[in-house]
A protein has these predicted regions:
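Long, internal scaffold/assembly segments composed of regular secondary structure
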Residues: 231-323
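Short, acidic/small-residue loops that bind anionic groups at enzyme active sites
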Residues: 89-115, 120-128, 293-308
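Short beta-strand elements in bilobed, periplasmic/extracellular small-molecule ligand-binding domains
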Residues: 31-55, 142-148, 205-211
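Short, well-structured alpha-helical segments in soluble
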Residues: 59-71, 88-90, 257-266
């Protein structure tokens, strides 16, 4: 990614302090279990280690570390029974979910040969789960429980931990980067309008405003011909260009991409929402004609770029890129009632990482429908198979909400006039899907990603403390 971020996960373990002097062998046992557990956390996150906690004071010290680090998530390993005062001081002042990991060392007891310290050390992690949740509820803390076993490995536990860490990375990306708004939303698309201060207060995402005049001149000082040539080749490697492509043909586009990449790094931008509604002449027309593929090159590198000035879909694109590896702007395009499928897609910039069915294409059109000027269109080709859609919307009080659905992309004819589009079948049927999706009140844009990701999106929503409408899965 052009702007790298790394989630910060607070990790600690708890045990009842009264057990340790009674059964001293529990000390090395718990130290070994905790060390092994920390190794299960993916290296994509920064671990803030609160240690093994057996007293209120140790719990408070862990909480101080978590607050100082501004953790995105807390993961708590339950080693054996423990009282909730070992946990609550560590999380009392945090506004992030607490994931309780109840992993038992042994798959099953050896009933006849199990003594008290063996039971406490290897078989009793489940003892306090309910107590912890009860007190997290009373403290108003969001929470989740993962139950499993250490012996023999437990892929389900590992998958859940990885999922939560992916979700935490979304929070860190929103907090540590910025959104660039260039111009303003498409006139009259009031579903896209947004209060940027409310956005920052509720979703931690700061908006930087940029004028088009700065964008027109952004490449004026780009003179490194080797960098431009390398980027031109990158463009040719990314797209099949109608009529053939050469380095010379995409030279100016490559200059802009080099400039935009530097701008993204300098301004720490992970989201772009842009729309130009002026005259497509001179330098304005030049950039406007090649902006779609130029921004597609940014999307490829992790910066979500949304057309029509849609900040909310830029966020949805970034979420899916972070958790699923791709994020493609889409909208309801058409319905094939004969086949009972929805045609979903959009014009404009897209994500090459979703285009695994074939290489993305680029062609020149004389007019961008509904917009100023003409120029290069890009079309991406999502594969047949599972697909997830995510939209972000708001209620009348400004609270955000996620709207999600899972479906399956099917083979068959698609539109070929230059816009990305796919044939999606939903379990509830096309007619019912459109009714349910629309009634949820999303913006008319959504983001798409290959695979099924609702479970991860639910974790992202838990971290952001926003509701989710699950339309179908």
């Amino acid at each position: 990614m052009l702007v790298e971020t790394k989630a910060r996960v607070g990790v600690f373990a708890i045990a009842l302090g009264a057990y340790l002097p009674q059964f001293p062998t529990l000390v090395p046992e718990f130290e070994g279990q905790y060390a092994a557990f920390k190794k299960t956390l993916p290296d994509t996150v920064e671990v803030i280690d609160g240690g093994i906690v057996t007293t209120k004071e140790q719990s408070m010290a862990a909480g101080d570390k978590f607050r100082t680090a501004d953790v995105d998530l807390v993961i708590l390993q339950l080693l054996t029974y423990a009282t909730s005062y070992n946990m609550l001081p560590a999380v009392r002042d945090l506004d992030v979910p607490v994931v309780l990991v109840n992993v038992q060392k042994k798959k099953a007891p050896d009933y006849a040969n199990t003594d008290t310290p063996t039971w406490l050390g290897e078989l009793y992690a489940c003892g306090a789960v309910g107590e912890m949740v009860a007190d997290l509820e009373r403290a108003g803390k969001r929470h989740a429980v993962i139950t499993g076993v250490v012996e023999g490995g437990d892929p389900a536990v590992q998958a859940e931990i990885n999922d939560w860490c992916k979700a935490a990375q979304v929070r860190r990306r929103f907090r540590d980067t910025n959104l660039a708004q260039i111009g303003r939303p498409y006139p009259g698309m009031m579903d896209l309008y947004i209060d940027e201060t409310n956005l920052y207060n509720r979703m931690w995402l700061y908006t930087k405003q940029f004028d088009w005049e700065k964008m027109w001149a952004i490449a004026d000082n780009i003179t490194d011909e080797d960098a431009i040539r390398a980027k031109a080749q990158d463009i040719l490697d990314t797209f099949d260009i109608e009529g053939g492509g050469t380095v010379e043909k995409v030279w100016d586009m490559a200059r802009y991409v080099v400039a935009f990449e530097q701008w993204v790094r300098d301004e720490k931008i992970a989201f772009v929402a842009s729309h130009y509604d002026g005259f497509a002449k001179g330098v304005a027309g030049k950039l406007d004609s090649m902006l779609i593929p130029a921004f597609s090159m940014l999307i490829k590198q992790g910066t979500a770029c949304a057309v029509e000035g849609d900040i909310k879909v830029a966020m949805a694109m970034s979420i899916l890129k972070t958790i699923a590896g791709c994020g493609q702007l889409s909208e309801m395009y058409s319905i094939d009632f004969n086949e009972d499928i929805c045609i979903i897609g959009h014009s404009g910039s897209g994500d090459a990482d979703i285009s695994t069915a074939r290489k993305p294409t680029m062609k020149i059109v004389p007019v961008f429908h509904g917009k100023t000027g003409g120029g290069y269109l890009t079309q991406f080709y999502p594969p047949v198979g599972d697909v997830t859609y995510l939209a972000i919307t708001q209620d009348k009080d400004g609270h955000f909400k996620f709207v999600v659905a899972e479906g399956v992309n099917e083979p068959g004819p698609i539109f070929t006039f230059g816009d990305t589009n796919m044939r999606t079948r939903f379990n509830c049927g096309a007619r019912e899907f459109v009714n349910r999706w629309s009634e949820a009140g999303p913006t008319h844009h959504m983001a798409a990603a290959t695979g099924h990701h609702i479970d991860t999106i639910l974790k992202v929503a838990e971290i952001f403390n926003v509701p989710v409408d699950v339309i179908t899965r």
